Amino acid sequence: MLQNIRIVLVETSHTGNMGSVARAMKTMGLTNLWLVNPLVKPDSQAIALAAGASDVIGNASIVDTLDEALAGCSLVVGTSARSRTLPWPMLDPRECGLKSVSEATHAPVAIVFGRERVGLTNDELQKCHYHVAIAANPEYSSLNLAMAVQVIAYEVRMAWLASQDAQTPAPGEEETPYPLVDDLERFYGHLEQVLLSTGFIRPNHPGQVMNKLRRLFTRARPESQELNILRGMLASIESSRNEKP
């Protein structure tokens, strides 16, 4: 089940950080590392700092875009160290661990970490169902990339160990089929297309409304069947408009 949890690093600029992250992951039983458009490729320094976790580096998936790293996932959590102009559903690391383990039993989960200096962009954070923030000392809250991964990975492991001891899963948690990220992105594209065709949003300025709608649906988190209903509603609107003389 832990193999279903992806640790995703976006545009990492130092190979030593890749190695340190691999070490942090493996100590907690995580091995599924994804590198999105790394500014440098893993090298001997990454292997050296992995300190016995070189297999995690060697088996890492290297992709060009975040969308590729999130493909097939039903849950995406993005790390964020600061509040944004558009509030988003938040988790603390413990909640992140519990939710990740719960959902990884039936579909891949991605926990996304941003660039060393600037983190994730707003557009990248909007691809996430939740954001997670580590409650560090406000007077000195600087965590390097591997430290942040270690904190989250520890909470994932604690949640996984607790799930092994539990006699039965929480009611309904494993039975809820949530849509994959790919399906959600297709829905958002379909929604924007319909709203443009009806004149509800302007072609030159769709962003603000679409961002707020993303936030609304992220907060509501529709199940797969509910998303199918929404897609059907959009298709019905398109059909009705096409039938008009």
UniProtKB/Swiss-Prot annotation:
GO cellular component: cytosol
Keyword Transferase: yes
Name of one Pfam family that matches: SpoU_methylase
Catalysed conversion reaction: cytidine(32) in tRNA + S-adenosyl-L-methionine = 2'-O-methylcytidine(32) in tRNA + S-adenosyl-L-homocysteine + H(+); uridine(32) in tRNA + S-adenosyl-L-methionine = 2'-O-methyluridine(32) in tRNA + S-adenosyl-L-homocysteine + H(+)
Coiled-coil residues: none
GO molecular function: RNA binding; tRNA (cytidine(32)/uridine(32)-2'-O)-methyltransferase activity
EC assignment: 2.1.1.200
Gene Ontology biological process terms, A to Z: tRNA nucleoside ribose methylation
Region forming the signal peptide: none
InterPro entries the UniProt entry points to: Alpha/beta_knot_MTases (IPR029028), RNA_MeTrfase_TrmJ/LasT (IPR004384), SpoU_MeTrfase (IPR001537), tRNA_m1G_MTases_N (IPR029026)
Residues noted as binding S-adenosyl-L-methionine in the record, renumbered to the chain: T79, S80, A81, G114, I134, S141, S142, L143
Keywords attached to this entry: Cytoplasm, Methyltransferase, S-adenosyl-L-methionine, Transferase, tRNA processing
Major localization listed first in the record, in broad terms: cytoplasm
Compartments where found: Cytoplasm
The family this protein is said to belong to: Belongs to the class IV-like SAM-binding methyltransferase superfamily. RNA methyltransferase TrmH family.
Function according to Swiss-Prot or TrEMBL: Catalyzes the formation of 2'O-methylated cytidine (Cm32) or 2'O-methylated uridine (Um32) at position 32 in tRNA.
Subunit structure: Homodimer.
Protein's name in the database: tRNA (cytidine/uridine-2'-O-)-methyltransferase TrmJ
